[in-house]
């Protein structure tokens, strides 16, 4: 149900033209859940470049303005590559519930990327629910995350 969801801060949304329609479907889902979001664009199906779309949304997560990011492109892969270049972002590209759950539990992912040409709106909304509701387990995973983040400082 609805009660599971409580975000201290808004969710950052961003997409290129290939992910625009899926972003809009997820946005409607967040509204149904009563969750706040900031839509960093794009706002149409006109062609834009996914790195340009990823950066402002991811910066909002890293700065603490937003809780997590939901990012969309044609496959989810390009925008995940862009997101993972941003210091402090741990982006996953998911199209199945198991990966989506465990990337939160074990990797403390803070950006979920999906492909508008890969994932339908129903599955996308399910994955968003899993992503937003699953807590990081910590424990043995803490040192692995620390090692992952240390790569950014080489």
Stretches with model-predicted labels:
Residues 12-32:
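Glycine-rich phosphate/diphosphate-binding loop of Rossmann-like nucleotide-binding domains
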Residues 10-11, 66-69, 88-90:
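Short active-site oxyanion
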Residues 53-71, 75:
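Short, structured active-site "lid" loops
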Residues 12-14, 18-19, 97-154:
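C-terminal binding/interaction regions
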Residues 7, 61-65, 104-106:
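Solvent-exposed alpha-helices and their adjacent loops that cap or buttress functional pockets
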Residues 71-117:
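Mid-chain, well-packed structural core segment of small domains
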Residues 1-6:
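Short, Lys/Arg-enriched N-terminal segments with co-localized hydrophobic residues
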Residues 36-47:
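A short beta-strand-loop structural module common to alpha/beta enzyme folds
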